[in-house]
Every structure is written in structure tokens, then in C-alpha cells.
Amino acid sequence: MVRVKICGITSLEDALVAVEAGADALGFVFHDESPRHVTPEQAAGIIAGLPPFIQTVGLFVNRPPAFVNDTATRCRLDLVQLHGDEPPEFCDAVERRVIKAFRVKDISSLDPIRHYRVAAHLLDAYSPKAYGGTGLTFNWDIAAAAKAFGPLILAGGLTPDNVREAVETVKPYAVDVSGGVESAPGRKDAARVREFIRRAKGW
């Protein structure tokens, strides 16, 4: 069964809604330019209130390895998601398992993947304006091809309305959503969270 990560968590209330709906992982954004940005202190407080067996993922964009590792330790993150232009050797310096994000324009966007020894690859839609969270989709046939390189997490413009088709088309290891289940940036809509997870998992 496909796994689901709800990203851009900014409150314990939203986190618990996602957990109760069946989310496998929660994402916390440590990128100042994002409307879903949280501080390490905020994230640590939310994570301390979670039940066991829920994975926590910290999202970073072009931050120094020392900041990434320090934040991961302070917040007790399970995984680190690198969503910027980090090279393979950067991933090797991270002290947690790494999810490396790649922004997809076309099939050539997959070329760098083979150089990264990471826990999973995340594919998101390319935008010149932002590193992620844009709500844009991309060609899912490209995503299906990326599975040859290891566990694939599909992101980019997913919503309750299209996630079932995405899962059936790509058959990814996991799907990742943020804006597609929000009522406003950084505010999750409980009904949309529940419906997204239900449809993603085929319940």
C-alpha cells in the first residue's frame, strides 16, 4: 500500500488530524521563504506531542550541513528531505537518512538521480519561482521511469481529486502533499486531509 506524507505541518492540531486520518509521515519545512515555515523550536514542540510510529521529516533548502544536522537532532527528526541544489556529497554529510528532491522539467531532469545514494527520491514539478509547494503537476510518465533508481515519492500538485489516478499511474512508494489539502497556506483542511489519504490508500 502506498504511504502518505502530509507536508507543511505548522500546528499540533493539524499533525494529529493527519495522524488520525492514517498519514505515515509528517513534514516540517525549515525554509524561511515558505508560508509553511516553522522554527526548530516549533517543530520540536509539535513532534513531542505525536504518538509513536509516525515518521517525521524535516525539509531544508540549501542550508549548511551543520544547520541540518543540528535541527534534526534538536527536533528528533527521522529523515531529512533536501529540496534545493544540494550535491551528492552534501547528502553524505547529513546524519539522518535523506530524501532528495528533484524538480522535473522533462525526462532529462532524471539524469542526476543516479549519483545520489539516498533513502528515496522525491519528484516535484519544476518552477522558476520556488523550490516546491507550488501546486504544479508534471508528466507522471517521467515519474514512473524514475522508479528504476530506487524508492520514489511522488509530489507536485497532488489533491484528493487526482491522487488516486497518480497512484495507479506511477505506483510510487509514497505520495507527498501540502497545498492540496489546505484551506490556506500552512493551515490543513481536515476533510481534505482525510479524503486525500483515503483515496491514496484506496480505502
Swiss-Prot record:
InterPro entries: Aldolase_TIM, PRAI_dom, RibuloseP-bd_barrel, TrpF_fam. One of its GO terms (molecular function) is phosphoribosylanthranilate isomerase activity. Pfam families: PRAI (PF00697). Its EC number is 5.3.1.24. It comes from the Bacteria. Disulfide bonds: none annotated. Pathway: Amino-acid biosynthesis; L-tryptophan biosynthesis; L-tryptophan from chorismate: step 3/5. It catalyses: N-(5-phospho-beta-D-ribosyl)anthranilate = 1-(2-carboxyphenylamino)-1-deoxy-D-ribulose 5-phosphate. CDD domains: PRAI (cd00405). Keywords: Amino-acid biosynthesis, Aromatic amino acid biosynthesis, Isomerase, Tryptophan biosynthesis. Gene3D superfamilies: Aldolase class I. GO terms for biological process: L-tryptophan biosynthetic process. Belongs to the TrpF family. This is N-(5'-phosphoribosyl)anthranilate isomerase. The gene is trpF.
